[in-house]
Amino acid sequence: MKALLVLGFLLLSASVQAKVFKHCELARILRSSALAGYRGVSLENWMCMAQHESNFDTEAINYNSTDQSTDYGIFQINSRYWCNDGKTPRAVNACGIPCSALLQDDITQAIQCAKRVVRDPQGIRAWVAWQRHCQNRDLSGYIRNCGV
């Protein structure tokens, strides 16, 4: 019985480990997911935004006390508008997903939700980190030597 508890704990802890992508690994995934060039947003811009939002960490979570919302995952997608965390007042959930889906090692749902975000009029400007760190900058270094 004790061995089963230990095994269960080990399996549970393994399933909640954060994935921190290496930059070329993430660049290849974003390219193969048709995010590169989506709505005119280059792969370099996506990479810059993801680095400055989460440092490529799938389990990044940041609480915003001003509006009681939380940003989730590699793209730091906000619970006020895009996902449901069950605690953000007046949440819209425009992506139609639980915020926990944005914390998965498999970032397929995060990519789909990011595509939904950029379809709005703000586009990539919805991400403050992109505005502060990426907009109107030379971003070529984000994919240099990645073969993408």
UniProtKB/Swiss-Prot annotation:
SUPFAM superfamilies given in the database record: Lysozyme-like
Keyword match rRNA-binding: no
Disulfide-bonded cysteines: 24-146, 48-134, 83-99, 95-113
Keywords: Antimicrobial, Bacteriolytic enzyme, Disulfide bond, Glycosidase, Hydrolase, Secreted, Signal
Protein name as catalogued: Putative lysozyme C-2
Organism taxonomic ancestry: Eukaryota, Metazoa, Chordata, Craniata, Vertebrata
Enzyme class: hydrolase
Its job: Lysozymes have primarily a bacteriolytic function; those in tissues and body fluids are associated with the monocyte-macrophage system and enhance the activity of immunoagents. In the intestine they may also have a digestive function.
Listed GO MF terms: lysozyme activity
Quaternary structure note: Monomer.
Recorded superkingdom: Eukaryota
Leader sequence segment: 1-18
Assigned GO CC terms: extracellular region
Principal cellular location given in the protein's record: secreted
The protein's Enzyme Commission number: 3.2.1.17
Reaction(s) catalysed by this chain's protein: Hydrolysis of (1->4)-beta-linkages between N-acetylmuramic acid and N-acetyl-D-glucosamine residues in a peptidoglycan and between N-acetyl-D-glucosamine residues in chitodextrins
Organism: Rattus norvegicus (Rat)
Gene3D superfamilies the record matches: 1.10.530.10
GO-annotated biological processes: defense response to Gram-negative bacterium; defense response to Gram-positive bacterium; killing of cells of another organism
